[in-house]
Regions:
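N-terminal membrane topogenic signal
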Residues: 4-22
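Aromatic-anchored segments of alpha-helical transmembrane domains
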Residues: 24-32, 73-84, 124-135
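Membrane-interface helix caps and helix-loop-helix hairpins in membrane proteins
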Residues: 32-40, 83-92, 111-112
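Cytoplasmic-side transmembrane-helix entry/capping segments in multi-pass membrane proteins
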Residues: 66-74, 94-96
């Protein structure tokens, strides 16, 4: 199949596929850390799983995967800074997963751009991973807030499901905003520009 592509096209593809190695390294570094501390359940947090999704999207050239992972890097970075950095400090593997993850996402979007509807896939991915987290992770970890009300919000919400409904609505709005921000920066290129680039 390689002979069917122009040399210029092949060269252009190599860097972005190779870029997938970085989020894979970030994911594996976190996996090693949590394996050593016997906390592998934490690998299902959105940002950790997002690095794996980003790597797969880059390796297999799947724009939808790249975009949904990229959208999650924005709220993920904020949540990580507030609830991890300010509370526990900076850790190498965690920093790579979040700061490195958003850096790779921004580079990847230079090629794959952003779709205005991509936030819906990011939201669907969140619901799926939260459901999986509820069944396969220890309740004590409360991964993706799938088991109980977030610490500090117990007085505001009398039940987990009222908390979940608000959380889900806020998450949907946040992902929409993140998607629109990235779309405003990485709008799809006009068809005429794409033709010029391919020539």
């Amino acid at each position: 199949m390689l002979c069917c592509y122009p040399v210029k096209t092949l060269i252009a593809r190599i860097p972005y596929r190779t870029l997938g190695v970085l989020p894979l390294i970030f994911f594996l570094a976190q996996a090693v850390y949590y394996w050593r501390t016997n906390q592998l359940g934490h690998m299902l947090w959105m940002c950790n799983a997002g690095n794996l999704i980003m790597a797969l999207g880059l390796f297999f050239e799947k724009p939808a995967l790249v975009r949904l992972a990229a959208i999650w890097t924005l709220p993920g970075l904020v949540v990580w800074f507030v609830y991890v950095v300010l509370a526990w400090g900076v850790f190498l593997t965690s920093t790579l997963a979040h700061v490195g993850g958003i850096a790779v996402a921004l580079i990847a979007l230079k090629r794959y751009r952003m779709d205005r509807a991509a936030w819906r896939y990011a939201f669907g991915w969140y619901l799926l991973l939260q459901l999986i987290s509820r069944f396969v992770t220890p309740p004590a970890f409360n991964v993706n807030l799938a088991h109980s009300v977030a610490s500090g919000w117990e007085r505001t919400f009398q039940s987990y499901w009222s908390f979940w409904l608000v959380l889900t609505a806020v998450t949907a709005v946040t992902l929409w905003v993140a998607g629109m921000i990235l779309w405003s920066i990485f709008r799809p290129r006009p068809a005429a520009e794409l033709v010029v680039r391919e020539v």
